[in-house]
Swiss-Prot record:
The keyword tRNA processing does not apply. InterPro entries: Ribosomal_bL36, Ribosomal_bL36_sp, Ribosomal_L36_bact. One of its GO terms (cellular component) is ribosome. It comes from Bartonella quintana (strain Toulouse) (Rochalimaea quintana). Keywords: Ribonucleoprotein, Ribosomal protein. GO terms for molecular function: structural constituent of ribosome. This is Large ribosomal subunit protein bL36.
Length: 41
């Protein structure tokens, strides 16, 4: 999982990316291609 300051560019890298907020953190999740996962931090 990558940790990035800005997730907007990462979200657009794959069409199945989903932006999710959990416990005050923002994640990008991708079930079809998990290598695109990221967390904002």
């Amino acid at each position: 999982m990558k940790i990035k300051n800005s997730l907007k560019a990462l979200r657009e890298r794959h069409r199945n990316n989903r932006m999710v907020r959990r416990k005050g953190r923002v994640y990008i999740l991708n079930k079809t291609n998990p290598r695109f996962r990221a967390r904002q931090g």
